């Protein structure tokens, strides 16, 4: 779970922890994997959750490669999950985060006390038209999720995880595989 949740919504974060969520930190993910726990990672994080609705058919990790390094270090396969409909539960019209970050660099404070990571303008419940990463109730739409076959890589270990070119190749493989599966899922349900 995004570490900002613990600062902004500590009550929600505590409830999520009761059902097994952990803070999105590599140290905690490594501990979980070494206990042979399944670890569900959202590489795109809050930017993926609040990306504009017109990007819903795209796999967006925003260059985040930590999940690849983690898998390589811990000799773990990546089991992709993709879904159709999740971005219809909230209609994000635009993300004003880049403009907000620019204003922050000029000295203006964040409107949310901390760096929000995303600042969407969206239509959703219960607010109607809302601005900012606020908690919301999902719109009632059908969701279709597919758990894809595991992806393994030819090389694992510290050396593989520290080779930027190899990490990029693994990242590209995962992203492309997930995009192909997402395209198939959209074709099946639209």
Regions found by a protein language model. Name each.
Residues 1, 22, 79-81, 145:
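Hydrophobic/aromatic beta-strand patches that form the interior of the parallel beta-sheet core
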Residues 1-35, 45-63:
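Catalytic core of membrane glycerolipid acyltransferases/transacylases, capturing the structured
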Residues 1-6, 11-13, 17, 171-190:
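Alpha-helical membrane-anchoring segments
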Residues 16, 70-71, 147:
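Structural element of the ATP-grasp superfamily
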Residues 32-35, 73, 138-140:
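Extracellular/periplasmic catalytic domains that process cell-envelope and extracellular macromolecules
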Residues 38-133:
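Membrane-associated lipid acylation/remodeling enzymes share a hydrophobic transmembrane-juxtamembrane segment
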Residues 91-188:
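Conserved catalytic or regulatory cores that recognize and/or transform ribose-phosphate-containing ligands
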